[in-house]
A protein has these predicted regions:
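Alpha-helical transmembrane bundles and membrane-interface segments of multipass inner-membrane proteins
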Residues: 1-158
Length: 158
């Protein structure tokens, strides 16, 4: 445990807690599609995403709930195994995978409990809106960016 990336599971749990608490606060405080402008380019808008990224497949008959739930569950297993096999010395990679695990878990919890993902971070410019997203999505994105950076900086033995 201490000699692998699993020592970063605390980061996964902290980010997962932040994701779930923020989603709970939005659901408790907002009606569906209610929006509060925070900055000229940013609003908190409560949205239920039945699909994947950018609401992909959201208009299907309901099968996508179980499809995306299964994909998220498999991703969580892969990330946990990956952390377990990552040496302690690969800190940046471990952090990246821990963040992506937290995002996958956060959205998996939403899909399993509600059948949709709770999104609320809404960026917009000149009347154009970027698709709403959440803390879990942000962790997946940040983890992916860190993984790309790690691939450029790591010493690889080929």
């Amino acid at each position: 445990f201490n000699n692998s990336g699993l020592r970063w599971l605390w980061l996964t749990l902290v980010c997962l807690a932040i994701d779930q608490v923020t989603k709970h606060c939005v659901v408790a405080s907002f009606s569906l599609y209610e929006s509060v402008n925070v900055l000229p380019i940013f609003s908190i808008t409560y949205v239920q995403n039945l699909g994947a990224a950018f609401s992909f497949l959201a208009d299907q008959g309901g099968w996508q709930r179980w499809f995306f739930t299964a994909i998220a569950a498999i991703a969580c297993i892969v990330f946990i195994v990956w952390l377990g096999k990552t040496p302690k010395s690969q800190t940046l990679l471990s952090i990246a995978v821990a963040l992506m695990l937290s995002g996958a878990m956060g959205n998996l919890i939403d899909r399993a409990l509600f059948g949709y993902v709770i999104d609320f971070l809404d960026f917009h410019w000149s009347g154009n809106h970027f698709p709403a997203f959440n803390v879990a999505d942000s962790m997946i994105f940040i983890g992916a960016v860190l993984m790309i950076l790690e691939s450029f900086t790591a010493e690889h033995n080929d």
